[in-house]
Amino acid sequence: MVMASLATRAQTTNMGHHDMVHLTTNLLYDAALVPNVGVEYAFAPRWSAKAHGMYAWWSDDSRHRYWRVAGGSVELRRWLGSKVNAFLLKGHHVGVYAGAYKYDFELGGTGNMADFNYSVGVSYGYSAPIGRRLSLDMGLSVGYIGGEYTKYDHEDGCYVWLADMRRNYVGVTRAEVSLVWHIELGRKGGR
């Protein structure tokens, strides 16, 4: 019932615009060779929800180099300002997010591996249009990262456990410079 009410409110306050879905990729992750994709949807005026995932499982066993990470996050955003059109997702936004991921990083020395780490926090960002269907979303998040990880070395063809560690980090948790593609739903002809 609540979701139906939100959907009806979103349709009636959309001022003639069709529903939009927004596909994103964080260019900072792309630069670090971590493919990623996100989907954001404005479910009510000034409110949107975003889901984001990343996956990179690169390895070179002959040199003992690993660059592996998999994970995702969800975020609830509130769009600010008097002239904001949240269905097009432009302007300033604040939000709350939660995420989980696993990783294995070794670049020829001591490696770090985690099966499950998590993060929670708050975000601030700004989204600026760079074309009719594209925008650039820049943001920063602060919060908490927690979980356990293992430090290891590679010696004589074997992986040697060094220590189990606990991560309790408070500070900057994410940076975002995302390319956003706005896709209008329910309309033929692309106009």
Regions found by a protein language model. Give the residues of each.
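Bacterial Sec-dependent N-terminal signal peptides
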Residues: 1-13, 179, 183
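Glycine- and aromatic-enriched membrane insertion/assembly motifs of diderm outer-membrane
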Residues: 22-104
